[in-house]
C-alpha cells in the first residue's frame, strides 16, 4: 500500500451525526449528501456508516454516483441533486433514484419514460428561492405540482430549495436567507391550497442547520457538518464536530544540504544554513495544493514546513540541522484534533492558507490515495 493514505474515521462521522441530531426537532430526517465520493471520503462506506447512525436519505450529484451505491447493496432512498439528461432516465428509473424536477418539459419526459418502462418515478420539486442555479420560480411551483400530481407514472415525493448564504453571519445575508425561507414557506402553502400533498419538505443545508431552526421542515441536508467541519469558521463554536478524514504520508528520504542550496522547481526556496531535508511522497496530483507550500506538517509532536514548490507527486520539508526524524516516520498533513495531538492541522486550517474551503480540500484528495476506514462504533 502507498505511504500516502487517507484514514477515514467512521466513528467520528457517526459522532457528528449524533451532534447534528441534538439540534433537530423531533422526527426531522437527515439526508446526507454523498456526492463527489462523499466529499472524498468514500461514498459506499460512508453511506453504510451514516445509515447505521440514523440517516434516512442519501443525496448524489449524478446518476452514476447513485448506481454505485445501489450496486453496493444500499437500498436507502437516494435523491439526485443535479438534473439528468434524457439518456440517463432509464437508469434513473431502473435503480429507483429520485430526481429533482423543475419544468414541464422534464416532467413530461420523465412520465413518458416511466410509462414505457412500467415504472413509478418519485420526484422532488425544486424551487429556486434565491440560489439561481436550478429550480422553478416560486410562481410556477403550484402549476408544476399539479402537473406532477396528474402524471400517471409520477409521484411527488418532496418539495425542496437550497440556501445561498445560510453560513454567513453578515446582516444582509441573514436577511437574504430569511427571505428565501419566507418565499419557500409561501410556495408550500400554495401547493397545499391546491389540494396537493408536498411530501417531504426539505431545505436546510449545513449553515441553516446551525442558524435557522425554522428551516428544518421534514428533513435537513447537512453535508460538510457530517464530515466534521462547520461551513464557515465563524460558526465553529455552534457545534462540536470531529473531522472524519486524516491525510498521512511517510518520510521516504532524508538528505543533508548546505547553506545556499535551493530546493524544488523554480529555486524559490534556498537554505539559509546547513540543514536536513526530508522528501514526502505526496504532491498536488494527490490533492496537496501547490499553494500550501510553507504549511507546517506534523511528525510525532513536532511541526516542519514544506519548502519550495510542491511537485506533482512529492514535496520536501525542512527538518532542521539536528533532526531526530527518521526515514519511514509517519507525517500528518491534516486530521482530527485530539488530546494526543491538540495542534493537528485540520482541513479548515489548510483551506485558510489556500484561500478555499474544506470541501475543496477533501474532495481534491485523489483516487490514487487509498482510503483506510476505521470501523465505526455505534453507541
Swiss-Prot record:
<comment type="pathway">
    <text>Amino-acid biosynthesis; D-alanine biosynthesis; D-alanine from L-alanine: step 1/1.</text>
</comment>
<dbReference type="GO" id="GO:0005829">
    <property type="term" value="C:cytosol"/>
</dbReference>
<feature type="binding site">
    <location>
        <position position="133"/>
    </location>
    <ligand>
        <name>substrate</name>
    </ligand>
</feature>
<keyword id="KW-0663">Pyridoxal phosphate</keyword>
<dbReference type="Pfam" id="PF00842">
    <property type="entry name" value="Ala_racemase_C"/>
</dbReference>
<dbReference type="GO" id="GO:0030632">
    <property type="term" value="P:D-alanine biosynthetic process"/>
</dbReference>
<dbReference type="InterPro" id="IPR020622">
    <property type="entry name" value="Ala_racemase_pyridoxalP-BS"/>
</dbReference>
<dbReference type="InterPro" id="IPR001608">
    <property type="entry name" value="Ala_racemase_N"/>
</dbReference>
<comment type="function">
    <text>Catalyzes the interconversion of L-alanine and D-alanine. May also act on other amino acids.</text>
</comment>
<keyword id="KW-0413">Isomerase</keyword>
<dbReference type="GO" id="GO:0030170">
    <property type="term" value="F:pyridoxal phosphate binding"/>
</dbReference>
<feature type="active site" description="Proton acceptor; specific for L-alanine">
    <location>
        <position position="265"/>
    </location>
</feature>
<comment type="similarity">
    <text>Belongs to the alanine racemase family.</text>
</comment>
<dbReference type="InterPro" id="IPR009006">
    <property type="entry name" value="Ala_racemase/Decarboxylase_C"/>
</dbReference>
<dbReference type="GO" id="GO:0008784">
    <property type="term" value="F:alanine racemase activity"/>
</dbReference>
<feature type="active site" description="Proton acceptor; specific for D-alanine">
    <location>
        <position position="35"/>
    </location>
</feature>
<feature type="binding site">
    <location>
        <position position="312"/>
    </location>
    <ligand>
        <name>substrate</name>
    </ligand>
</feature>
<dbReference type="InterPro" id="IPR000821">
    <property type="entry name" value="Ala_racemase"/>
</dbReference>
<protein>
    <recommendedName>
        <fullName>Alanine racemase</fullName>
        <ecNumber>5.1.1.1</ecNumber>
    </recommendedName>
</protein>
<feature type="modified residue" description="N6-(pyridoxal phosphate)lysine">
    <location>
        <position position="35"/>
    </location>
</feature>
<dbReference type="InterPro" id="IPR029066">
    <property type="entry name" value="PLP-binding_barrel"/>
</dbReference>
<dbReference type="InterPro" id="IPR011079">
    <property type="entry name" value="Ala_racemase_C"/>
</dbReference>
<dbReference type="Pfam" id="PF01168">
    <property type="entry name" value="Ala_racemase_N"/>
</dbReference>
